[in-house]
Amino acid sequence: MSDTAPLTIAVLLGSVRVDRQGIKAARLLVSALEKRGHEAVLVDPMEIRLPLLDRMYKEYPKGGAPAELEQLASLYRRADGFLLVSAEYNHGVPPALKNLLDHFLEEYFWRPSAIACYSAGGFGGVRAAMQLRMILGELGMPSIPSLFSIPRIGEALADDGQPKDERTTKQMERFLDEFEWYAHALRRQRASGTPY
């Protein structure tokens, strides 16, 4: 596989709230990745409707997991990276995102993650992002150094998800440049073998 071959990126949205704003950011990022020639698959907990975690995917007998988990496992195994779109609820990670993440483990290994975070206020979700970094490292998909933080998301993105200002666009492009670099680098390294 060439160094510049298109990547497969799973874009995990972390909100199921009514009138959620994160869907605009998720669609923006999916579109931006596709414009770069990559396959970007939106994983939306509003559509998937996973149950609250009582058994991880790996704890089901082979072929016995619910269809939704089998589909996600298949996507995650072929993914080159994970881009998380997270709100900040009470200074923390949204429960829908944590539930979505916790159903899997080995499927994430040796792949980078990137965090796009947002809020209605001025902090842009960064407090949730700091918690996510610890979680993602433990799940085996360390996050890249940069964040794509969107403060005042209702003002920053139009209804169709397009940025209303140049700063947001520039920040997103730089963030995606960095994420691509890590995804290509770790894909090369996975191809040559993993520690276990």
Locations of regions flagged by a protein language model:
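Glycine-rich, flexible loop/turn motifs
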Residues: 48-49, 56, 65, 104, ...
